[in-house]
Amino acid sequence: AVWQFREMIKCTIPPSDDLLDF
């Protein structure tokens, strides 16, 4: 799943990049 991949890179990317999660 895509959200699973985002959760994995969430530790690498800054919180400001959370907009890409949409």
Swiss-Prot record:
Stable after incubation at 70 degrees Celsius for 10 minutes. Retains 80% of its activity after incubation at 80 degrees Celsius for 20 minutes. Signal peptide: none annotated. GO terms for biological process: lipid catabolic process. Its EC number is 3.1.1.4. The keyword Thylakoid does not apply. Optimum pH is 8.2. Stable when incubated for 10 minutes between pH 2 and 11. Retains 70% of its activity when incubated for 10 minutes at pH 1.5. It catalyses: a 1,2-diacyl-sn-glycero-3-phosphocholine + H2O = a 1-acyl-sn-glycero-3-phosphocholine + a fatty acid + H(+). Keywords: Calcium, Hydrolase, Lipid degradation, Lipid metabolism, Metal-binding, Secreted. Binds 1 Ca(2+) ion per subunit. It is an enzyme of class 3 (hydrolase). It is found in: Secreted. Its main location: secreted. GO terms for molecular function: calcium ion binding; phospholipase A2 activity. GO terms for cellular component: extracellular region. Its cofactor is Ca(2+). PA2 catalyzes the calcium-dependent hydrolysis of the 2-acyl groups in 3-sn-phosphoglycerides. Belongs to the phospholipase A2 family. This is Phospholipase A2. It comes from Struthio camelus. The lineage of its organism: Eukaryota, Metazoa, Chordata, Craniata, Vertebrata. The gene is PLA2G1B.
